[in-house]
Amino acid sequence: MTMLATEKNPMIVSMGPHHPSMHGVLRLIVTLDGENVTNCEPILGYLHRGMEKIAENRTIIQYLPYVTRWDYLATMFTEAITVNAPEKLANIQVPKRASYIRVIMPELSRIASHLLWLGPFMADIGAQTPFFYIFRERETIYDLFEAATGMRMMHNYFRIGGVAVDSPYGWVDKCSDFCNYSLPKVNEYERLITRNPIFLKRVEGVGTIGGEEAINWGLSGPMLRASGVQWDLRKVDHYECYDESDWQIQRQEEGDSLARYSVRIGETKESVKIVQQALKVIPGGPYENLEARRLNRGKNSEWNDFEYQFISRKPSPTFKLPKQEHYVRVEAPKGELGIFLMGDDSAFPWRWKIRPPGFINLQILPQLVEGVKLADIMTILGSIDITMGEVDR
């Protein structure tokens, strides 16, 4: 009896750009041998809007509303880097009170970003319950943002030399209440997730990256620290008032998806501690106390000094950038967010180069998914934590 010859052809699957596990308009062309991934080709650019070229045709003040559309889940960091770059270039001083506000707001944004990473990540690997839990705390953070800035997500709050407005009446107390409330909730997530046997089966040993490999690929943020490299720009660059807070860099040695989860959970706790410490020592205290002292002591009292202001001075709409170049970076939730700025004595930047952490971290995806099962792509991509607005710019 003649047997028919068996043919083995690879299967090509297109994942995205509208698949919910892609976390935005990312497309992956995946080549499969049965259930095993043999090749993965990411297709980017669906959300490209020319953000760098837009910056070169706008003043810094005009450009600020645009930057919240990069990483729209952690907008305080994109605003921070946008004002930090011209501040460093022009050597503009920031009052101490404004600097503390510029620590509190991004750390709240970091907590919100990590929470919104955790929920969809768990949903990707089959656990729906945490997705609903995280929105409880995230909504509280957005209420704080709305009270301080008027907007829940696209804040347009940072300014060259400080922030747009001071914290409103009663805001410091509400923020302190949130910190006291949120720490037990993060511990609740850990009890619910970390030792769950099904969760561990899906993430332990999946998508492993070594420390040297992570450095060679230019990874940053939790992706780098989960591979055993103790590198956090808040400690390295000593910007704003982070040196005046007592907190620890979160690091894991394993380099897998579980390690990246552990780093982000640990960072959420540390961010709460940073906010709590900043609220206690912010110059002038709560806004209502500062205003009462100013009214009581008179116009020329020390409570009207530079360090108690929320902005050094409001910049001119035609603020000119000196003819210099500078690279500024901050530790965003996803990694090192940087701006290379070149000025030419005009109100418009000559060059505005963005270093997006999500784009750099995403480079390693094809290597990580090669040889794994198709279902593990969701785990690995979710553990990288990307926002396509930042990746495509």
UniProtKB/Swiss-Prot annotation:
GO terms for biological process: photosynthesis, light reaction. Belongs to the complex I 49 kDa subunit family. It is a peripheral membrane protein. SUPFAM superfamilies: HydB/Nqo4-like. NDH is composed of at least 16 different subunits, 5 of which are encoded in the nucleus. Its EC number is 7.1.1.-. It comes from Huperzia lucidula. The keyword Metal-binding does not apply. Its main location: plastid. It catalyses: a plastoquinone + NADH + (n+1) H(+)(in) = a plastoquinol + NAD(+) + n H(+)(out); a plastoquinone + NADPH + (n+1) H(+)(in) = a plastoquinol + NADP(+) + n H(+)(out). NDH shuttles electrons from NAD(P)H:plastoquinone, via FMN and iron-sulfur (Fe-S) centers, to quinones in the photosynthetic chain and possibly in a chloroplast respiratory chain. The immediate electron acceptor for the enzyme in this species is believed to be plastoquinone. Couples the redox reaction to proton translocation, and thus conserves the redox energy in a proton gradient. Keywords: Chloroplast, Membrane, NAD, NADP, Plastid, Plastoquinone, Quinone, Thylakoid, Translocase, Transport. It is found in: Plastid, Chloroplast thylakoid membrane. Coiled coil: none annotated. InterPro entries: NADH_Q_OxRdtase_suD (IPR001135), NADH_UbQ_OxRdtase_49kDa_CS (IPR014029), NDH1_su_D/H (IPR022885), NiFe-Hase_large (IPR029014). GO terms for molecular function: NAD binding; oxidoreductase activity, acting on NAD(P)H, quinone or similar compound as acceptor; quinone binding. One of its GO terms (cellular component) is chloroplast thylakoid membrane. This is NAD(P)H-quinone oxidoreductase subunit H, chloroplastic. It comes from the Eukaryota.
